[in-house]
Amino acid sequence: MKRVLTALAATLPFAANAADAISGAVERQPTNWQAIIMFLIFVVFTLGITYWASKRVRSRNDYYTAGGNITGFQNGLAIAGDYMSAASFLGISALVFTSGYDGLIYSLGFLVGWPIILFLIAERLRNLGRYTFADVASYRLKQGPIRILSACGSLVVVALYLIAQMVGAGKLIELLFGLNYHIAVVLVGVLMMMYVLFGGMLATTWVQIIKAVLLLFGASFMAFMVMKHVGFSFNNLFSEAMAVHPKGVDIMKPGGLVKDPISALSLGLGLMFGTAGLPHILMRFFTVSDAREARKSVFYATGFMGYFYILTFIIGFGAIMLVGANPEYKDAAGHLIGGNNMAAVHLANAVGGNLFLGFISAVAFATILAVVAGLTLAGASAVSHDLYANVFKKGATEREELRVSKITVLILGVIAIILGVLFENQNIAFMVGLAFAIAASCNFPIILLSMYWSKLTTRGAMLGGWLGLITAVVLMILGPTIWVQILGHEKAIFPYEYPALFSISVAFLGIWLFSATDNSAEGARERELFRAQFIRSQTGFGVEQGRAH
């Protein structure tokens, strides 16, 4: 039965702009037993790690941050594993397969946010926070209002991202493994809950590390075999690809992805600032011992991800040569079997045979598990630490907080499974785009200004943050993706697909205006507290390290 894999595009941040290139009609494939066996090996191994981790999770610190004893190198790998989705691998390589050079430009968009995290956020975040970014945002501001806003921003981002991942996971597994969609969604949800429920951050970290290593190895092998085919010459790679691609030399020309400068700028800002506001990424900086290790984490993560996206570019051009020009991988109509999303999977078969094809399919499944585990833990910590322990029941014991966190994991898991089933045939490609827009318009401005602007007050942060969040949601609804494609209206009220340029501007302007006009005694006190916060953020003085942090 024919299915539309728009959900796969949704598992890639802001992939909606490339939906035409990386989505299309696909068929459920025959059961891939080699892939299933390899995936079962991965599951058994990671469940063993979860059991090992569960014996070492004795406190709140262990559960949320793995005791703060993850090294910078390990955390860099885990961050890369948390950030690189299955669709980063399949989607971007498919985009290169169809559009050529534009795929490289698009993939680089995922890296532009990391220098901001490295130079502006990582060190200060680690010096000021303990478990969530709300610890930093509320350091000198009113705990209640700021934590509620931060938790809401986190939960909305996590929920949207999680639904998109679950639907994408079901479609992807149905495509690669031949398993039933509902079985796939339940399987992902159950494994996700087991990793987080029993192993906490320690198990999640090692699942992400293993996934990153497997993905980097698989992509490296594919790129190596492609380059070997062309004599390790990029000139030969591009020449052969241009010779067989229907667009010819045009695949080396940029500019086909974004329709106008406003959309390009808005997309870029959303990718850049959204990355710096993702709660499951920011939470990883509390797993290392100090600010130095936090900086090293970003350095290693950026290196791993940069290397990975270069590999997807080579893989995409390799697919043009070895898959696009091979009738074995096409149906009777001349289209790629399974759709363009299968370009990298077919290439795995072309360069490594059925065994390597099974390995790549299993790795694609593993990437989904690593991402949803990180999302679930971030959502649970927002509820248990930010809302329960610091707003609704101040002074709650560690045991009570951990109990709430684990209950939240179960609730999030069940909700994710239910919504994954309900949204099976819905267009959810907008969800991750909206998640990034909210992260960029609500979370990022508050984090940045709370650390760098001495005049920020609770009033400004609250009003500006909520304005940014609401603006992002409203403009996304009124834009072409939801208003026209989903709701069926003839013309969009808001003409641009990406609201980030406007919603980020509203957030920063609102925070500045309402802080600058705040003449209350509370506002004056909050401004006076900035100096002490600044000294701690720069020096780390007073920060607890390692297992005690």
UniProtKB/Swiss-Prot annotation:
It comes from the Bacteria. GO terms for cellular component: plasma membrane. It is found in: Cell inner membrane. GO terms for biological process: plasma membrane acetate transport; sodium ion transport. CDD domains: SLC5sbd_u4. GO terms for molecular function: acetate transmembrane transporter activity; glycolate transmembrane transporter activity; symporter activity. It is a multi-pass membrane protein. Belongs to the sodium:solute symporter (SSF) (TC 2.A.21) family. This is Cation/acetate symporter ActP. It comes from Escherichia coli O1:K1 / APEC.
